[in-house]
Amino acid sequence: MNSKKHLGHTARKRFGQNFLHDTSVIQGIVAAIYPQPNQFLVEIGPGLGALTEPVGELVDHLTVVELDRDLAERLRHHPFLHQKLTVIETDAMQFDFDELYTTENLAEKGQKLRVFGNLPYNISTPLMFHLFKYHDVIQDMHFMLQKEVVKRLCAGPNSKAYGRLTIMAQYFCQVMPVLEVPPSAFKPAPKVDSAVVRLIPHKELPHPVKDLYWLNRVCSQAFNQRRKTLRNALSTLFSPENLTALGIDLNARAENLAIADYARLANWLADNPPADVNNDEILDSEE
């Protein structure tokens, strides 16, 4: 028996497909999302419809973004949901959520996007960074992720899980763990534990920065050298005198600073950029 086959579809490794089938877990996720009939919901990676079906039954319309051509075609011909579904066959990493918000006239309706999904673990972090760019048009997000990633999203200072992903996620959103999910809830079963997280974009950013590039840059540089003191890790960006003037302990390490501290550092860099920095540099590294 092919353990990677579920409901007639073979999971594709390149898409990071693991299909959710545990009824109690599905019910728990749908309850957490709490979809209402007139809301505009968007599912990323609907797969074989484990969440699509129970959510679709509760709403008037559901938009799904699916990269797998075969799965997208199945959803277009879904036996009882096809009239409710708008299937967008594309890579969510390339999708413009602002355009969807505008096209659907959600501002006039006083609504924002509600986004959810069982995200492929191999792209979950860059996909969330992509979604953070659209925080102004998103009401909330509910995602199934690798448990380790959820711990990092929800972490606080002075912990091993605290890192660049924590800072960037909590800069844009209030982050809350929802439930933990064992590998047995999926087919094929992943080799890691999973968890569901809720992210609610802040209505007003609590620690706004002048240029997001610098927040990204200072976090990347600090956490990529997290065993070093900040005096050494950030030596190409700040002099010891600058750090001290900004209220930073020279002997502190990356995990010791709060988001407000990183925002303060980023705003100083926006006003005092180092001469040799390339602002087009792409910072996608994990900390």
Swiss-Prot record:
One of its GO terms (cellular component) is cytosol. It catalyses: adenosine(1518)/adenosine(1519) in 16S rRNA + 4 S-adenosyl-L-methionine = N(6)-dimethyladenosine(1518)/N(6)-dimethyladenosine(1519) in 16S rRNA + 4 S-adenosyl-L-homocysteine + 4 H(+). It is found in: Cytoplasm. S-adenosyl-L-methionine binds at residues 18, 20, 45, 66, 91, 118. The keyword Signal does not apply. The keyword 4Fe-4S does not apply. PROSITE patterns: RRNA_A_DIMETH, SAM_RNA_A_N6_MT. It is an enzyme of class 2 (transferase). Belongs to the class I-like SAM-binding methyltransferase superfamily. rRNA adenine N(6)-methyltransferase family. RsmA subfamily. PANTHER family: DIMETHYLADENOSINE TRANSFERASE, DIMETHYLADENOSINE TRANSFERASE-RELATED. This is Ribosomal RNA small subunit methyltransferase A. It comes from Haemophilus influenzae (strain 86-028NP). The gene is rsmA.
